[in-house]
Amino acid sequence: ALPIWNDHFYGRNGESLGALSVEELDRIRGQEKKDWSKQIVPEARIEHLDTNAISLARENYKKKMNKSYISEEVDRMTDEQFLTKLKLMINGKITNAAMLLLGNEDYDYLFKTVPEASWRVYDSKNEVSDYEIFKIPYITLSERLFGKIRNLTYRYMPNQLTLFPTETKQYDMWLLRELLNNCIAHSEYTYGGRIYLNEFEDKIILTNPGSFLPGKIEPVLNPG
């Protein structure tokens, strides 16, 4: 429950509490009412999931937990038991999260709005010179998207005391992966838009449908 004082709802604002705006309050109430990831895809069945994606999820889970007895337990589970353990299936039903992460792209029409991601590369005139659209399963989205990026190697001389140049990649792939994961986690999938990875000659811009922050970003960048 949100704290109330003097007829105002309050929420965290940095290190202190501040009165919530109507927009912020509506967003919080909306989040409390429904969680898209936990909603059921009515016509989806476990047969509509990608078996390779499920196998990858099993391996990722065992690697993350890093305990032999958990790995053995996971190996004994059926796919339904494993997905239920991860709360990707609820009462035998497929959730949006399960379909998004592990779904077979042939059945993406089972979503009310089909989730997609797109890579676009821009030339020196800021015109799209190439593109590709990516569908579910999103568990492999980062590998598929990042396989398109031209991550050039730069070589430079750090100082005059060495004969060998230092090599560095144009982009930090770990950082890009974190940014993409945030795009996936904070997308508003009910809008039906795409996640875009726009690659320019000197930068990459990631965008997603929906909004991460309420209102405009200027007050956040310039709080004074």
Feature annotation, model-predicted:
Residues 1-224:
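Conserved N-terminal catalytic/coupling substructures associated with nucleotide/phosphate chemistry
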